[in-house]
Regions:
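Acidic (Asp/Glu-rich), glycine- and aromatic
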Residues: 140, 149-150
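Flanking scaffold residues of small Cys/His-coordinated metal-binding clusters
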Residues: 132-135, 244-245
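Beta-strand elements of modular eukaryotic interaction domains
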Residues: 128-130
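Extended alpha-helical scaffolding segments
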Residues: 1-123, 150-502
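Short Cys/His-rich metal-coordination motifs, predominantly Zn2+-binding knuckles/fingers
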Residues: 140-143, 253
Length: 502
C-alpha cells in the first residue's frame, strides 16, 4: 500500500453520510467536502497530522497568493501527479527494503499485538477510556500507517528504554480548522518562505526519513542537523510489521480491507538528540534558568481544561520574568495570511504518567475576529478564569487543612480538589463561549460579566463543598475563616478594588 496513491483515508461527507475510504488524489483534486471518520478522536488527529505532514513535503505553496488559491481551488490531476512523483517510493507501507515508518530486520522474541500501537487501548489505564472490544485486533493498511505515525510523533514511547518523538512523549498539537478536510490540511501547510524561515539551515541537514537512512545506534544528533522531512516523519523506535492476514473488516475503522495487520516486532534502540527541533505544529515554552535559555514543547500535564492554555497556543510572549512562549508556526501563518478572520483551533494530545496514557485530549476552540490583534484581551480572560479558580481553591484548602498555628481544626477532606474539578467543568461552558463571541475591541463589559459569573460560581461551589460539614461544632470557626479567605481573594480580583458581595 502506498499512501500517495492508494485508498487509505477514512472519511464521510461533511454533512453526513456513509464512511468511505479515499486516496490522496481524491482529497486534493475534488470539491467534495469530507471530514475524517474514525472511532477515536486521537486517531482522527493523528490522521490529520499525517495528511498535513505529507502535504508539507509534496505541496507547499510558493507564496501567499498560491496558498489562498489552493485553499479555494482543488488541484488538477496532472498537477497532483507532478507533485507526488518525486516522493512515491518513500510512502510504501510494505516496501521490500524501506517500508514506511519501519526498520527492516528487527529482532524480537515475541510478536507485539497491534493494540500496543493504539495509545490507551491496552495497559493498566485503559479503563480510563471507552474503547470498542478488539479495536486493535487487525488493522487495515491506512489505520496501521496512522497508528505508526501517531506512536512515533504524538504519543509516549513504549517505555522501558524506548524513545519518544522529537517533541517529547505527549506534545500538544495545534491545527487551524477549515470548512472541510481538504482546506484544513492545506491551511496547515507552511508556505515555502515560512518553511525556509522555520528551517534556515535546510541545505546542511540530513533530510531523508529514518526508514531510508536509519538513525545509528548510540548516535548523538544535533537537532539542527535534522531536516524538515526527516523531522516531520521521525521514527524513534525500531518497529517492523509482521506479514498481514487476508481480507476482512478492519477492527479500527470498520471498513473491509484486502490486507490487515495483526502484530509487529519491536526492539530497544538508543540514541540522543541534542537541542529542540522546531516542530511547526506545537507551541513552545521558553524559560531562562541561571542565564541559560531552555525550550520545551507544551504538554498536557494536568487535567485542567484546554482554555487554561489558550494564551500559550495563540499569543506569542517575549521572555518576561524568565518565562515566554512561541505559538505553533501553522497558527502564526494563519494570523498573518488571514488577519481579519476568526479562528477555529484544533488542540489535542495526551496526558500521561511515563508510558501510561491517563487521558486523551481533543478540543476545538473558537476565537472571534480580532484575536490576532488582541492577545492582551485573551491573556486577561485566561488570567481572570485562573484567578477565580485559585481563590476558590485557597479558601477550601484553608477549610480542609485548618490553621495549625491558631489551633483551628480542618475538615481533613480534600474538598478543594473536588471543587477545582467542578470549577473547571463549569468554566468550560463560560470561557470558550466568551472567546468565541467577544468583540475584542470592546471587551471590558464582557470581561466584567465573566467576573460576575465566576464570582457566583465560586460562591456556589464553596457553599456546596462545605455544606456537609457546616454544623460540625469543631469546624464552625474554621468555616468562618475559610469563608473570609474566599471573600478576601474575591475582593482582590475585582478591578480597582471594586466591592464584593462578601
Amino acid at each position: 500500500m502506498n499512501l500517495l496513491i492508494d485508498n487509505w483515508i477514512p472519511v464521510r461527507p461533511r454533512n453526513g453520510g456513509k464512511v468511505q475510504i479515499i486516496n490522496l488524489q481524491s482529497l486534493y483534486c475534488s470539491r467534495d467536502q469530507w471530514r475524517l471518520s474514525l472511532p477515536r478522536d486521537d486517531m482522527e488527529l493523528a490522521a490529520l497530522a499525517l495528511l498535513v505532514c505529507i502535504g508539507q513535503i509534496i505541496a507547499p505553496a510558493k507564496d501567499d497568493v498560491e496558498f489562498r488559491h489552493r485553499i479555494m481551488n482543488p488541484l488538477t490531476e496532472d498537477e497532483f501527479q507532478q507533485l507526488i512523483a518525486p516522493w512515491i517510493d518513500m510512502f510504501y507501507l510494505n516496501h521490500a527494503e524501506h517500508p514506511f515508518m519501519q526498520t527492516k530486520g528487527v529482532k524480537a522474541n515475541d510478536v507485539t499485538p497491534m493494540e500496543k500501537l493504539l495509545a490507551g487501548v491496552s495497559g493498566a489505564t485503559n479503563c480510563a477510556f471507552v474503547n470498542q472490544p478488539g479495536q486493535g485486533e487487525a488493522l487495515c493498511g491506512g489505520c496501521t500507517a496512522i497508528a505508526l505515525f501517531n506512536q512515533a510523533n504524538q504519543a509516549p514511547g513504549f517505555g522501558g528504554g524506548f524513545k519518544s518523538g522529537l517533541r517529547g512523549g505527549t506534545p500538544v498539537t495545534t491545527f487551524v480548522r477549515g470548512i472541510d478536510l481538504r482546506s484544513t490540511v492545506l491551511l496547515n501547510v507552511l508556505t515555502l518562505p515560512r518553511l525556509q524561515k522555520q528551517f534556515p539551515n535546510e541545505s546542511h541537514t540530513e533530510n531523508q526519513p529514518t526508514w531510508i537512512k536509519p538513525i545509528k545506534s548510540n548516535e548523538s544528533i544535533p537537532a539542527s542537523s535534522i531536516g524538515f522531512v526527516r523531522g516531520l516523519f521521525w521514527q524513534p523506535a525500531h518497529i517492523e510489521l509482521c506479514d498481514p492476514i487476508g481480507i476482512g473488516k478492519c477492527s479500527c475503522c470498520g471498513q473491509e480491507s484486502n490486507l490487515r495487520y495483526t502484530g509487529f516486532l519491536k526492539e530497544k534502540f538508543t540514541f540522543t538528540v541534542n537541542g529542540l527541533w522546531p516542530h511547526p505544529h506545537s507551541p513552545c515554552l521558553v524559560t531562562v534558568k541561571k542565564g541559560e535559555v531552555e525550550e520545551k514543547f507544551l504538554a498536557f500535564t494536568t487535567s485542567a481544561p484546554s482554555w487554561t492554555q489558550i494564551s500559550r497556543v495563540v499569543v506569542d510572549k517575549i521572555i518576561q520574568n524568565e518565562n515566554g512562549n512561541r505559538v505553533a508556526a501553522v497558527v502564526n501563518q494563519f494570523r498573518n495570511i488571514a488577519p481579519q478572520s476568526p479562528l477555529e483551533l484544533i488542540m489535542g494530545g495526551y496526558r500521561n504518567n511515563q508510558a501510561s496514557i491517563l487521558e486523551r485530549r481533543h478540543d476545538v476552540l473558537m476565537f472571534n475576529q480580532g484575536w490576532q490583534q488582541y492577545g492582551n484581551v485573551i491573556n486577561e480572560i485566561v488570567t481572570v478564569g485562573l484567578g477565580y479558580k485559585t481563590a476558590l481553591r485557597k479558601a477550601l484548602y484553608t477549610f480542609a487543612e485548618g490553621f495549625k498555628n491558631k489551633d483551628f481544626k480542618g475538615a481533613g477532606v480534600s474538598v478543594h480538589e473536588t471543587a477545582e474539578r467542578h470549577f473547571y467543568r463549569q468554566s468550560e461552558l463560560l470561557i470558550p463561549d466568551v472567546l468565541a463571541n467577544v468583540n475584542f475591541s470592546q471587551a471590558d463589559e464582557v470581561i466584567a460579566d465573566l467576573r460576575d459569573k465566576l464570582h457566583q460560581l465560586c460562591e456556589m461551589l464553596f457553599n456546596q463543598s462545605v455544606a456537609p460539614y457546616a454544623h460540625h461544632p469543631k469546624l464552625i470557626s474554621t468555616l468562618v475563616l475559610a469563608r473570609a479567605t474566599l471573600y478576601k481573594h474575591l475582593r482582590e480580583l475585582k478591578p480597582q478594588g471594586g466591592s464584593s458581595n462578601g
